[in-house]
Amino acid sequence: MENCTSKSIYKSGLKQFANRTIVIDTSIYLYKFSEKGAVAENIYLMISVFRQYNIVPVFVFDGKPPIEKKALLIRRKIEKDTAEAKYNELKSAVESGESDMDTATMVEMDKLKKQFIRVTESDIEKSKSIMRAYGVPYIESKGESDHLCAFLVKHGFAWACLSDDMDMFLYGCPRVIRHLSLLHHEAVFYDTVQILYDLDMSQEVFNDIAILSGTDYNLNDQKSLSDTVRLYMKFRESRNKKPFCEWLIETTNYIDNPDNLQRVRRLFDLNLFLETHREEFKEVVNSMPFQLREMDLDRLKEALADDGFIFG
């Protein structure tokens, strides 16, 4: 997105989003906060900052992951287990005196520890109890939260989605907020329609380039982004009237598995997803409108009692 203008991607203070409804891809932030060892503290801070600007945050929790992500989840588990084993090995060596706790060892242990961060069921339930007490809405998705977040923004039930997941752009989410700083009350805003205009690219072509470059659904079938873009520019210069990927298949050997490309395309088709999950979306829509409720201070104190919070 290097070629995009400041109209499509720019840093903004949260004041710009005042009085808006923003859906949140919650799992991303639970992992970030868990990495800091302060899930409850940061969820509380996040809600406090949003309420300061009268932003209605709608936290969307993941449900059951799709079968298509099985390979990714297995790989992530192996990576976490490997990192944890290496961390424990280093820790044991230091504790037994076999190794010194020097700066390099400390850095390596800290790096490894971040690689096996896990969000527990307790973290999730604690977060929900804080949200209920603080008077902000949350939704429990039956599947992954991405589809639901994009749907709510595309259909006008929310203004934007807060997520660092690039998949939001593939779902065609019109407005995405990334890189949130709770310290500085700012974030980076992405206008998807303007981005496509700047790139002179359709949503379909954007998705194909992103899919070919690799998503969570085609880990073993990835191409270089720069190579894919280079081929797209060659396609543009040819002025061929066929779709980009059809041209690729006919004139190159770049796409190894056209059927797999088509399969992943369907996974990012929000209209297709809506057809198969109509009841879930209907249930969410019936719970509208999203709004802030009055804070229940007693329940909030109870929810944060084990986290060292002191209320004046």
Where are these regions (language model features)?
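Non-catalytic nucleic-acid-binding/docking modules located in mid-to-C-terminal regions
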Residues: 4, 8-18, 53, 185-312
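Short alpha-helical segments and helix-capping/turn motifs at coil-helix boundaries
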Residues: 5-15, 41-48, 146
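Noncatalytic, basic helical substrate-engagement surface that gates or grips nucleic-acid strands
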Residues: 17-141
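Acidic carboxylate-rich catalytic motifs and surrounding loops in phosphoryl-/glycosyl-chemistry enzymes
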Residues: 61-63, 137-148, 220-225
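Short, hinge-like loop/turn segments at secondary-structure boundaries
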Residues: 75-78, 157-159, 178-181
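Acidic, metal-binding active-site segment of PIN/NYN-like and related structure-specific nucleases
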Residues: 149-177
